């Protein structure tokens, strides 16, 4: 397996993790958004653009990562991406659970998005869906395949816990089969649902 070493994240780079909404179609056991806040915030495009402009003045070569919630639920994500690209940020990534709402793959191009970064928390359907919800494994795999087929670079985020650490050794072959170019292993932050969970 060959995993590309990206220039997007380096020791000296600035990374802007931009939460554009808190709405999500899933209810993951380790979600970092407090349950009472989920779905309550949805930034209008005007506000997103204003923040992107502010970020570009302070860190013009930063990497922008659009987050949620599920960012593809935002109806103006494509316009936010295009504006971020216009401002000249170093790279643009969209974190997603793979459902890819609003036909986002047809509304932006691989020239505009450096990576779609998919969240998958198990090498098997049983493990992932036990954490992220029924059907989420198939949706994520399908989303990855669609993105790669359209020429987008795909990365994968694996949030490790006692529920899925045993499947980490199974991931390399899956990454290779899916054409994943970056793989991130992250630990659970003790906030949101995770703070009250035993995962």
Please provide the spans of the model-predicted regions.
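Radical SAM/AdoMet-radical enzyme domain recognition
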Residues: 45-66, 74-190
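Short glycine-enriched, charge-decorated loop/helix-capping segments at active-site entrances
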Residues: 34-42, 129-135, 198-199
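Canonical Radical SAM [4Fe-4S] cluster-binding loop centered on the CxxxCxxC motif
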Residues: 9-46, 59
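Radical SAM enzyme core and accessory elements
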Residues: 1-11
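Conserved alpha-helical segments that form or flank metal/cofactor-binding pockets of metalloenzymes
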Residues: 69
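A C-terminal junction/extension of Radical SAM enzymes
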Residues: 8, 165, 191-199
């Amino acid at each position: 397996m060959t995993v590309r070493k990206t220039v997007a994240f380096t020791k000296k780079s600035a990374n802007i993790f931009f939460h554009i909404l808190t709405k999500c179609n899933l209810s993951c056991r380790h979600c970092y958004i407090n349950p009472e806040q989920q779905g309550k915030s949805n930034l209008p495009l005007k506000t997103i653009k204003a923040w992107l402009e502010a970020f570009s003045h302070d860190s013009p070569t930063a990497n922008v990562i659009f987050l949620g919630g599920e960012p593809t639920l935002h109806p103006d994500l494509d316009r936010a991406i295009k504006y971020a690209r216009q401002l000249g940020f170093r790279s643009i990534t969209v974190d997603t659970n793979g459902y890819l709402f609003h036909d986002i793959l047809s509304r932006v191009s691989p020239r505009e998005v450096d990576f779609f970064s998919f969240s998958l928390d198990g090498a098997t359907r049983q493990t992932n869906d036990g954490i992220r919800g029924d059907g989420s494994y198939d949706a994520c795999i399908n989303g990855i395949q669609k993105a790669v087929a359209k020429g987008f670079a795909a990365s994968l985020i694996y949030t490790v816990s006692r529920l899925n650490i045993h499947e980490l050794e199974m991931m390399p072959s899956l990454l290779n089969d899916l054409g994943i170019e970056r793989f991130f292993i992250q630990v659970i932050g003790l906030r949101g649902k995770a703070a009250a969970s035993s995962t």
